[in-house]
């Protein structure tokens, strides 16, 4: 539920995905 500061509208989460973030509502979130 914490915004990771990366969007995933056109491309999936990249850098933040390595930190455990996933795409939700066009934004990368963690928990």
Swiss-Prot record:
The keyword Metal-binding does not apply. The presence of a 'disulfide through disulfide knot' structurally defines this protein as a knottin. Probably participates in a plant defense mechanism. GO terms for cellular component: extracellular region. Pfam families: Cyclotide. This is Cyclotide cter-R. There is a cross-link at residues 1-31 (Cyclopeptide (Gly-Asn)). GO terms for biological process: defense response. This is a cyclic peptide. It comes from Clitoria ternatea. It is found in: Secreted. Keywords: Disulfide bond, Knottin, Oxidation, Plant defense, Secreted. Disulfide bonds join 4-21, 8-23, 13-28. Its main location: secreted. Belongs to the cyclotide family. Bracelet subfamily.
């Amino acid at each position: 539920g914490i915004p990771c500061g990366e969007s995933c509208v056109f491309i999936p989460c990249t850098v933040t995905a390595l930190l455990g973030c996933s795409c939700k509502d066009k934004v990368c979130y963690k928990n």
